[in-house]
């Protein structure tokens, strides 16, 4: 598990670089020690954007000879093994240095108020791979490698023996001296070797210092305040005169440690945030936000005192105003001024960005609503017009009228509809028609025919328009059979009996086009429409009346058709018409588009051109057309259709008590193997 966490640390560092944080990380420090010392400051900055972030804390003890003890604090137990992976990757990538890390001690830190787990790492430098851009060459060999391992193990043992005896500030021995004596790197320092020059005396007057640094506090080991900047005295009255301890005026917000010199010295390289206590503030300031000071703690060994160099922890003009402060209270050299002004601009940009995001979200919601409404409109438009015609109208193009050489038109109406309307309430008529038309509309999808219009009880559909297909007659015929079945499910509101419909079908050429601008309709024109209407008006209740051309279109297509005979058709003269009885190759479920369970595993096509398992459709076995003729005298004879016994029908029943001397009962079946009308592929 430790190896996995270490590997995760290495990849986490690579992920941070890929996410664009590499420039920020490179500027934290000029060497590994400075890099680690400033990690807490980076976490403090990131916490402004990620308020839920719970970052660990790091503290470094170092010596001039290249010694390092890394203290890791976290309230997440078991994740300390990620640290070596991150630190070693940083040292190799940013500082071209190979380091090895091992754990010296693990315990619970009692001096901290937040981060509980305290892990001490020993950081040992292996060898310099590159110093200031120049390659350092060193012979490689088994002896050197063995010596390095022995030196590393020896250093580790010495550190484990001496670690717990290291004193911390304050003490007789300075903190840096203790670390320098205990932790030694044998391969060179991790810090630069620059040596500054200090003056023999401080050339700054006390008053000038307090004015130039208006926010600073000097306190001793007992937390007694010895010195304070002018603005500290202004906003924390009595801090010098009342002789109270500093921890009575302030509490430490970050890092989460107890307020004493020992704890502060342990985190001397961390950024400190102090907050005034409300109970110590004057009554006039208790209602205002408490003053927060952010800065650095510096231990002065010769004076045995700590100085806190700080600035007001405000991020915007609004916070500055709420604290009853002004920009003039902040020293001109203090970058807090620039931070407040820049952050104010950033807040304004963020506000604009938030408003933009809000508007984008509103626009997205409106776009979704518009898409939904557009889809509803298109659905309604496609219900009124053919899809390709509707698309042309949406694009603003004119739809040219089209001539179709052959198509099949169907008309239907309700028998005695006028009498039903006279005996019922209007709402009953509406409910009856709505129930009937809903069933018919579903059948148009099953058989893929186009519904042209409905006027009162009249229902008109066409096959082969607006998309020409060879199977238009079969589709309309199957639709008519489905209409006849569906009509039996709709009750007459007067008698309570199933309603009866008349259906007429005719095949021929038509002219089709869009008529009207305000409410455009797709209409059919030509004598074919008139003839189809005449077939319906001259039909009989519960019968599907066929014209001669419709009969020819359905011939040899697997339908049972009965010859009605010659009748007088208004405006057409005498015509020989027929009645459509049934589809010999399809069941009622297939006609109605109902799902049927598979029986013998054979695949057949359904009226909706869908393939599913179903019993085989009966076929003619002798592959020859069989025509049976008779007259009323021998109508009782039994005949065989498509190889199955069918009882002979009385011709007077066939025409509903309107016999004709020329009437002949004819049954036409397919010669040879015939595909069902529903299996035609467009």
UniProtKB/Swiss-Prot annotation:
Heme binds at residue 43. Keywords: cGMP biosynthesis, Cytoplasm, GTP-binding, Heme, Iron, Lyase, Metal-binding, Nucleotide-binding. Residues 592-667 are annotated as: Disordered. It is found in: Cytoplasm. Residues 408-536 form the Guanylate cyclase domain. GO terms for biological process: cGMP-mediated signaling; response to oxygen levels. Residues 649-667 have a biased composition (Polar residues). Binds 1 or 2 heme groups per heterodimer. Disulfide bonds: none annotated. Its EC number is 4.6.1.2. The keyword Cytoplasm applies. It catalyses: GTP = 3',5'-cyclic GMP + diphosphate. GO terms for molecular function: GTP binding; guanylate cyclase activity; heme binding; metal ion binding; nitric oxide binding. It holds the Pfam family Guanylate_cyc. The keyword Transcription does not apply. InterPro entries: A/G_cyclase, A/G_cyclase_CS, H-NOX_domain_sf, Heme_NO-bd, HNOB_dom_associated, HNOB_dom_associated_sf, NO_sig/Golgi_transp_ligand-bd, Nucleotide_cyclase. Activated by nitric oxide in the presence of magnesium or manganese ions. It comes from the Eukaryota. There are two types of guanylate cyclases: soluble forms and membrane-associated receptor forms. Heterodimer of an alpha and a beta chain. Belongs to the adenylyl cyclase class-4/guanylyl cyclase family. This is Guanylate cyclase soluble subunit beta-2. It comes from Rattus norvegicus (Rat). The lineage of its organism: Eukaryota, Metazoa, Chordata, Craniata, Vertebrata. The gene is Gucy1b2.
